[in-house]
């Protein structure tokens, strides 16, 4: 058996589990993952240690939690055990991919491992001299690399995970995260943790109260400088008659798996 490296484990989005803690938390990047991780660590008395280890809370998850001997095996046993309640935090797929796009614009253009791939993709389409990337182009890029089996980035992959989703007892929509986690605590006899103080993260890109993006925002090539100068647009501005069908096609598996919570019309109205 090939031994997984730390980077490989990090990319797997393994659930959060602790022996003796009654909840297994399944999650996806760009779906409240930092808040859920903090909630989990607080319940297990590890949050202070994790924040001391690194300002970026996921470093503790990657370097410490996922590196524990037998951790993946524990995950696989736990999701099949009646001793654990398995929850998964999910997010409207349209809102999530907008968040991924804004995150790319804000912080990932320089360090993102896909930057060279995106640059090549643009050059092949005669866009090599274009500065930045529009939301429409971002969705086209995701579609194209997915067709070639190269959609490596968990921020861009669908949320549905065949390894874990079939074992989930309850879906917790990010839009109702506080209530969903409180209900989990009630059912499992856990003390209440107020997530309000845990929800702030440096990688959130909240919409500006006032922005100056053009009406046809989804076709507008943007960079981090655009966010500084024009503000952060609301998701509803980027989700239009062109991009909504693209999102629906790319993340159809999520819409089918989480149809109880998310429909196309809701995605557009958000």
Locations of the language-model features?
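Membrane-interface amphipathic segments in extracytoplasmic regions
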Residues: 1-270
């Amino acid at each position: 058996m090939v031994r997984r490296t730390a980077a490989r484990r990090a990319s797997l989005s393994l659930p959060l589990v602790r022996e003796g803690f009654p909840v297994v938390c399944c999650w996806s990047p760009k779906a409240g993952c930092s808040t859920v991780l903090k909630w989990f660590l607080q319940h297990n008395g590890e949050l202070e240690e994790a924040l001391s280890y690194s300002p970026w809370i996921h470093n503790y998850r990657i370097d410490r939690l996922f590196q524990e001997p037998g951790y993946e095996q524990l995950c696989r046993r736990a999701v099949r055990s009646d001793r654990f309640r398995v929850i998964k935090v999910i997010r409207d797929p349209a809102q999530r991919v907008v968040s991924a796009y804004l995150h790319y614009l804000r912080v990932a253009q320089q360090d993102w491992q896909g930057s060279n791939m995106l640059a090549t993709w643009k050059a092949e389409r005669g866009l090599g001299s274009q500065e930045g990337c529009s939301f429409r182009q971002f969705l086209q890029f995701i579609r194209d690399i997915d067709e070639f089996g190269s959609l490596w980035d968990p921020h861009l992959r669908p949320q549905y995970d065949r390894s874990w989703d079939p074992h989930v007892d309850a879906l917790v929509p990010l839009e109702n995260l506080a209530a969903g986690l409180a209900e989990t605590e009630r059912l499992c006899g856990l003390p209440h943790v107020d997530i309000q103080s845990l929800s702030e993260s440096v990688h959130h890109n909240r919409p500006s109260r006032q922005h100056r993006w053009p009406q046809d925002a989804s076709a507008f090539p943007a960079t981090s400088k655009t966010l500084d100068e024009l503000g952060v647009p609301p998701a509803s501005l980027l989700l239009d008659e062109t991009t909504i069908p693209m999102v629906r096609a790319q993340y159809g598996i999520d819409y089918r798996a989480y149809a109880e919570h998310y429909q196309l019309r809701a995605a557009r109205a958000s």
